[in-house]
């Protein structure tokens, strides 16, 4: 089945295969560094997310790729589209801020130090009938620590690649295997 590939693998020699594996590892490490660098620049643990449901239609559709930032100094306003993550839930949610409340800092020392007011938020999907209170798992409001970021831009339908990879894991592993094999057998 893979006899030609095995012959090519033997013909290339150990050093060449090792060099190709090192090049492949460099590409992977570079991708991770770029991802972490984007996270630091945008102050977001996940600066790029994919819309996984239709709850934000017509603003965003399933498969849209969203670009996020999370500036510390900026307060969220009603109407902002945010991505938040509740503790215990592994999927971030993209919804619009419906209400905000500023809570002044507690204690005299905090006020004198000039700490900013903390912000509480209530969100709702544009395509949903009710707010997200039931999604908060016992919380009354979202706090700033739950927010992954504010949507700054998007690319329509580009995220369908991610959705397809998650819906069909065999496709993901097949693509990774083929890419790895091609990287090892490349003759540069």
From Swiss-Prot:
Protein name: Signal peptidase complex catalytic subunit SEC11
Signal peptide range: none
Record family assignment: Belongs to the peptidase S26B family.
Name of encoding gene: SEC11
Domain comment in the entry: The C-terminal short (CTS) helix is essential for catalytic activity. It may be accommodated as a transmembrane helix in the thinned membrane environment of the complex, similarly to the signal peptide in the complex substrates.
Bilayer topology annotation: Single-pass type II membrane protein
GO BP term, example: signal peptide processing
Span list, region C-terminal short (CTS) helix: 174-185
GO cellular component, one term: signal peptidase complex
Source organism (scientific name): Laccaria bicolor (strain S238N-H82 / ATCC MYA-4686) (Bicoloured deceiver)
Residue positions of the active site: 55 (charge relay system), 95 (charge relay system), 132 (charge relay system)
InterPro entries on file: LexA/Signal_pep-like_sf, Pept_S26A_signal_pept_1_Ser-AS, Peptidase_S26, Peptidase_S26B
Entry EC no(s): 3.4.21.89
Keywords: Endoplasmic reticulum, Hydrolase, Membrane, Protease, Signal-anchor, Transmembrane, Transmembrane helix
Catalytic activity: Cleavage of hydrophobic, N-terminal signal or leader sequences from secreted and periplasmic proteins
Topological domains annotated Lumenal: 42-188
Transmembrane parts of this sequence: 21-41
């Amino acid at each position: 089945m893979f006899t030609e590939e095995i012959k090519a693998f033997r013909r290339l020699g150990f050093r060449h295969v090792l060099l190709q594996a090192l090049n492949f590892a460099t590409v992977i490490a570079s991708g991770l560094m770029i991802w972490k660098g984007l996270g630091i620049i945008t102050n977001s643990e996940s600066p790029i997310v994919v819309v996984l449901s239709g709850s934000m239609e017509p603003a965003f559709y399933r498969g849209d790729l969203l670009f996020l930032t999370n500036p510390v100094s900026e307060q969220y306003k009603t109407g902002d589209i945010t991505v938040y993550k509740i503790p215990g839930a592994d999927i971030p949610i993209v919804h619009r801020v419906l209400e905000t409340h500023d809570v002044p800092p507690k204690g005299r020392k905090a006020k004198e130090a000039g700490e900013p007011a903390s912000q509480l938020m209530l969100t709702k999907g544009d395509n949903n009938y009710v707010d997200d209170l039931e999604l908060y798992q016992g919380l009354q409001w979202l706090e700033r620590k739950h927010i992954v970021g504010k949507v700054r831009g998007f690319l329509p339908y580009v995220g369908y690649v991610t959705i397809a990879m998650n819906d069909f894991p065999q496709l993901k592993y097949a693509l990774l295997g083929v890419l790895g094999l091609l990287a090892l057998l490349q003759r540069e």
